[in-house]
Structures are given as C-alpha cells and as structure tokens.
Amino acid sequence: MSAVKAARYGKDNVRVYKVHKDEKTGVQTVYEMTVCVLLEGEIETSYTKADNSVIVATDSIKNTIYITAKQNPVTPPELFGSILGTHFIEKYNHIHAAHVNIVCHRWTRMDIDGKPHPHSFIRDSEEKRNVQVDVVEGKGIDIKSSLSGLTVLKSTNSQFWGFLRDEYTTLKETWDRILSTDVDATWQWKNFSGLQEVRSHVPKFDATWATAREVTLKTFAEDNSASVQATMYKMAEQILARQQLIETVEYSLPNKHYFEIDLSWHKGLQNTGKNAEVFAPQSDPNGLIKCTVGRSSLKSKL
C-alpha cells in the first residue's frame, strides 16, 4: 500500500517588475524580482485519485502574485512574501502552508552629469537580495533573508598556514595571498506570530540587509585573514550583535584560487613569491567553506 508522504506544488520563475512613480518630483523607482510560490495542504487526492478539485491552478497562483504586487508594496521583500503567503492560507481552507521564495534583481540608479537620474538605471552587478518566507497555519511566519552573488577580491592581507599536513598534502603555507569569493550570506529571523508582527518590524528588514552587506565588505577588506573560516565567523558574529531579531547567520564562501605563474623559464623572469604580479585565475576546482553561527543559547547541530 502506498501513501503520499509529502507534497507541495505551485508556480516558479514568475518574473515581476513594478515601478513607483512620484508625481510630485517625477522620480521613478523600479523593482524587479523572480517569485516562486509552493503550496501544501489537503491535496493528496490530486496525486492518488486524480482529483483536481483540490488544486489551486498554478496559473491562478501566478495571477495572484501579480495582483498582490499591484495592491501592496513589494519592498521590503520580506513583507511582500509574508503578505503573499498569508493570502493563500487565509483564502483556501484546505491550504495550510505557503512557501514563497523571492529573488530581487539589482537596478541601481544612474548618475548623469553628477546627479541621480529620475528614471534610468544600470545593472552594475549580478548581486541579488533574496528571501524565503514560510507561512504555516497555526505556526506563524518564518523568514530567511539573504544576499548572494556579491563577488569580492583583495590582493593581499590573506594568509593560510599551520594547517594539517600528511602524505596527501602538497599545498604550501602562505602568509600573503589573493582572496576572492562570491558571498552567499543568509540570516534567519525569529519566528513571527503573523503578518501583523511582520508589519511592525518592516524598517528592520532593509536596515539589516544593509548592515549585513556593510559588515561583510568591511570585515573582508580589513581583516588580515588567517583563513576563510576565521573571517566568515567574524562577519556572522557582528551581524548577530547588531540585530537581536536574528537567530542565526549562515555563510557559504567559495575560495576562488589565483595561482602564481612561474616565468623563470623565459630569460629568468621572476614572477613568484614577493615578485609575483601576474596570476592565472582558476575557474575550478575551488574551496567551499560553510558555517552557521547562532547565539550561544541555541543548540549546535554539529
């Protein structure tokens, strides 16, 4: 005898663009995002008995995303995701959970002749702001915020030495190396009782995103890094200290390697050690370092 153990469905890759027009100043502000909504509830019969009566059509989910974006603010995305998820569990009695993922695409206002342009923008990087909102009936709202695709590099002030050495080790110790990574940072908010509580904390979502970004960049730049592990822990520690509603901070940092090129074969040209100026950036393989840091009162899952 078979039974459905878990099921969710919905609409993915819904692209949304919204413009806010200030009629007084003529300044326009744009937002672009990609949204995924997955629903859970009493939907087993759609799988086991071909009963479509319990299915909220994914096309209807798409339409709901557009209508909700028209009728509500789409920023901060934590609020928009909470409004959207709450709609589904309140509208449909048999739907008990809504999972909303939002990826915000970057549009930065252009500066023209030294002044911000009122309606022109540039995508100056592939950095993204993301949220995962889980609205569960009777259990409140869980929100994870994150930034990803923030590519950084520093040409010095990074070390790696004192690591375990055995018969598999060929890596040389170094007290000065290039450090580059694509930052993926996630912070888990405390559980919110419902949409009203989320609304009461709206200013903190943008402020915390800005704080996390600023802490990440400042620590990366200024820390004389003993390792990626040590630096990412310092980043997470500072974010937790600056926002008490955050329960955990998680970093995932690839270590993107830049190798010295030995050019001594060409007329004795010196390009290693202190003389290294030309390097070969490596696409793969790369290191990958992950860490979740929480408050000491929370149990570790190590």
UniProtKB/Swiss-Prot annotation:
Optimum pH is 8.0. It comes from Aspergillus flavus. Disulfide bonds: none annotated. It holds the Pfam family Uricase. Signal peptide: none annotated. Urate binds at residues 58-59, 160, 177, 228-229, 255. One of its GO terms (biological process) is purine nucleobase catabolic process. GO terms for molecular function: urate oxidase activity. SUPFAM superfamilies: Tetrahydrobiopterin biosynthesis enzymes-like. This is Uricase. Urate oxidase is a cofactorless enzyme involved in the metabolism of purines. Catalyzes, in the presence of molecular oxygen, the hydroxylation of uric acid to metastable 5-hydroxyisourate (5-HIU) which is further degraded to allantoin. Keywords: Acetylation, Oxidoreductase, Peroxisome, Purine metabolism. Pathway: Purine metabolism; urate degradation; (S)-allantoin from urate: step 1/3. Optimum temperature is 30 degrees Celsius.
